[in-house]
Amino acid sequence: MIILFDFFDKKSKDLYYSLITSGLHGNAVVINDDGFLPQNINSPYSFFCNMEGKNGNPLYFNQVPLPDLWEIKGNNIEAEIWDFSIKRAKIFYQEPKYKRQVKNIDWFDNNKKVRYTDHYNRFGWCFARTHFDKNQNVTTKSYFDKDGKEVIVENFRTGVIILNWLNKDYFFDNRVAFLNFYFSLMGWNLSRIWYNSLSTPFFVSYRMTYPGEDILFWQEDIEDTIPANMRVLLESTNTRTQKVIVQKKNTYHKIKSMLPKEQQEKIGYLGFIYPNKKNNKGRKDIFILTNSDQIEHLEVLVHHLSDYHFHIAAYTEMSFKLMSFSQEQNVTLYPNISRTDLDNLFEICDIYFDINHGNEVDDVIRRAFEYNHLIFAFDNTCHNRELVLDSNIISHTTCEQLINLMKNLSGSIMYLLEQQREQTSNETKERYKEILGGYGNA
């Protein structure tokens, strides 16, 4: 079986973790290789460029090779390359950014437009280069081995891929043909392909010339119509993909309501299995991670929940407004928090308040869920409704409702935690095996 991902993003990682945890194994393949794939994840680009099984470390930001007298200026977010007063390039870090490991470098022309992007891998060498035209459209992308030899050239205007492998040139009309060549070399069983994208992975499955039992895992929202490629699968009785697993509850119900009964049978729902990193001890320690001083009803909550302790952290300096809360006995502030202190807060706190305005910081809701924090949010600040109980998302106009919930929490926290695991997108190994067990491990 092949588990085929377009990108190894958060949702792909969640699906892969859920499958492996459930004992549903396959050869995981990622099409868009960013150079930092885990060792157990395959990629045709890594294979042909001989990146698999190598040793080395990511390139640190100040190790980028430069001409004489050029310099690098950086912080924990990004870095820039300067030629005296001229900015020549911008360095983007691999997550987590505080480690300052180089992932991509945009090199500018004299008009301050990106001329090309160098892509670095987890071994510290430039494994690919993307070229842009004057309108900033991608034209070609070249992939290299460790010695800088060009191995693959992909033309984004024509779709053609040229592979130089074992002193021979191979030409492919598109990525599907390229992937099929790679699969044939690997000798994998192609009778089952599980995939989570309606782009290249869909076409790999759709154009297979022999029978198989494939599954599409749909992880996105939909608008007012079902995507065309998904409709092709649902309306056909002879494609390899006869099952669509939707991984967002609301999207599942929406899609199902738009289908005739015979097509509804092809749709199923399955969330994700999330790690369970610690037991909740019912402590009255509340954690908030923010990049803003706009925290909904913070003053009221601190005043009325005096028997709770608020731990408020930020990766940056805090404003005077937020620092003023240091005078409160039940508040501890952590400006410029270190990773060690942040990890400790996940351990010592058992409640998370998602009440800060602005962007979610560092996927904190997901991490709080994994650490079994009971999560509460206001309706105008909730950053991840898939992991928060509906009953714990409070109207921002009724702060007293949250206060009352917290004052009466001690006897129900374990029950609510159980509900948080059962009624959100969290799944169990048993349900994964029940839904997918008949399809997997071929």
Curated annotation (Swiss-Prot):
Required for the polymorphic O-glycosylation of the serine-rich repeat protein Srr2. A stabilizing protein that is part of the accessory SecA2/SecY2 system specifically required to export serine-rich repeat proteins, probably Srr2 in this organism. The GtfA-GtfB (Gtf1-Gtf2 in this bacteria) complex adds GlcNAc from UDP-GlcNAc to Srr2 substrate, attaching the first sugar residue. Stabilizes the glycosylation activity of GtfA in vivo. Interacts with glycosyltransferase GtfA (Gtf1). Interacts with glycosyltransferase GtfA; probably forms a heterotetramer with 2 subunits each of GtfA and GtfB. Part of the accessory SecA2/SecY2 protein translocation apparatus. It comes from the Bacteria. Pathway: Protein modification; protein glycosylation. One of its GO terms (biological process) is protein O-linked glycosylation via serine. It is found in: Cell membrane. It is a peripheral membrane protein. It comes from Streptococcus agalactiae. Keywords: Cell membrane, Membrane. This is UDP-N-acetylglucosamine--peptide N-acetylglucosaminyltransferase stabilizing protein GtfB.
